[in-house]
């Protein structure tokens, strides 16, 4: 249900009005997602790419358990992770209550690792 994209009603309305958005995926994509999730979590202990992993705690469009499992298995020196409790699926398109801390965390992470300001 598109209602769970964001707490921002305009984001939901824009999504529903977009003719390119639909509720179907191909069988090939579904298979890839089903296979890649567990495979990615299995590689988490050897993950070497600096990563900021953020997920929505109230996501009803995808199960956040995969993000949580990856975060718990990955080296904390390489993967910084955070669950934004109460936020819906589109973290960057949420209401300011949710989006502001998301964007602040991204900015802080980029500055700390790459000297880049978002």
Name every feature range the model reports, one short phrase each.
Residues 1-28:
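Alpha/beta-hydrolase-fold enzymes
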Residues 25-43:
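Active-site nucleophile elbow and catalytic-triad environment of alpha/beta-hydrolase enzymes
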Residues 27, 63-67, 95-96, 103:
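Conserved strand-to-helix beginnings and helix N-cap segments that scaffold or border functional pockets
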Residues 49, 63-73:
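Short alpha-helix in the alpha/beta-hydrolase fold that links the catalytic acid
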Residues 78-118:
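Catalytic active-site module of serine/aspartate enzymes centered on a nucleophile-bearing elbow/loop
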């Amino acid at each position: 249900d598109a209602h769970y994209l964001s707490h921002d009603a305009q984001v939901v309305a824009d999504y529903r009005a977009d003719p390119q958005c639909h509720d179907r995926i191909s069988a090939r994509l579904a298979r890839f997602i089903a296979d890649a999730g567990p495979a990615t979590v299995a590689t988490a202990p050897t993950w070497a790419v600096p990563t900021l992993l953020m997920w929505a705690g109230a996501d009803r469009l995808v199960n956040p358990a995969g993000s949580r499992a990856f975060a718990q298995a990955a080296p904390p020196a390489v993967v910084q992770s955070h669950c934004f409790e109460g936020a819906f699926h589109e973290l960057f398109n949420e209401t300011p209550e949710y989006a502001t801390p998301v964007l602040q965390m991204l900015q802080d992470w980029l500055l700390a690792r790459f000297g880049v300001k978002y």
